């Protein structure tokens, strides 16, 4: 019984986040509440093969900074982060 409580406590430190790209491709992450978003951004960029500095990450319509964490953004389990690729120029 004590093991169940300890395990539930460990799970409470983590959050599941879904990152959705422009092409509707989904990447799921399980991170700690205190993990910096810079780490998640880099991991997403590595998985998709795109340079992290050309990507824009948004949560609830607001841009995510590298020093943000799921805790500072008040994220909950299964929240969605949207990813857009930077566009330059055009008419």
From Swiss-Prot:
Disulfide bonds: none annotated. One of its GO terms (cellular component) is cytoplasm. The keyword Nucleotide-binding does not apply. It is found in: Cytoplasm; Nucleus; Cytoplasm, Cytoskeleton, Spindle; Chromosome. It comes from the Eukaryota. Covalently attached to tbx-2. Covalently attached to lin-1. Covalently attached to lin-11. Covalently attached to sop-2. Covalently attached to bet-1. This is Small ubiquitin-related modifier.
